[in-house]
Amino acid sequence: MPDAFAELRHELAVANRILANEGIIDAFGHISVRNPKDPNRYFISRHRASELVEPSDILEMTLDSKPVVPTNVRLYSEMVIHGEIYKVRPDVNSVCHHHAPSVLPFCATGVELVPLFHLGGTLGSKVPFWDSRDELGDTNLLVSTPEEGASHARALGPHYMLLLRRHGASLAGTSLRECVFRSIYTTRNAELQLRALAIGALGPLSPGEVEKCGGHNLGPRGVERAWEYWVTRLQKAEAMWAAAGLPRMKDLGRIARPQTAGLTPARSAPRRVARAASKTRARNRR
């Protein structure tokens, strides 16, 4: 039977690998996307490191974070992060949770993360904190129960980024590609803030600048341009892996094309990828 969501599963697998390739997600972390035909369901990978996720790993879940089709495969322990946000935020169609090194100092100290450059406008007007101790006392710091997931979702409120004390960050987007865009550029903003603090006083964006920068950067042309760039970087990385005899994801290039009407479809880079692989094989023979 044909899979009506084959393209979506493929794109979600690519999103996982992009976030790994860009250093946002390592062995731990995950990203999901809401079912575009049924808002009471979402898609997410089985329990696996994002760098290794394949379309066949993608499962469909209810908003209670239970598999739609019963399965014996292992699931992420923090699925409720996704399901509970989808329950209370109908505007959100993608959720990412990560522990990027640049955001962890803010999680450890409680220092506010503020937008400092134009692409940092994707932070939004405020980045709230969630401290699980406030409602739940001592825990293992994972968000793994419905109660913890609901508390986490309440802390996010109407915002698009949440910092978890002593843990990491959760991001939301109106689309999968927007969520990837926000996940990457909010970590870049965190890197900038850490460096800027070593030089002098911060000069954050004004509320008006945040609104205008965020609206511009998250428009279709900005998101699609960045997506094409990240897919190309991933193609090059996977070509190097293939040259070294490591497995790579099939049909990666086809997902680089923009989804927005009026945009010129992205050209794949098979020749560049082949040349990179050839050069690597030549070096390995020396």
Q: Which role fits each region the language model picked out?
A:
Residues 1-286:
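Glycine-rich flexible loops
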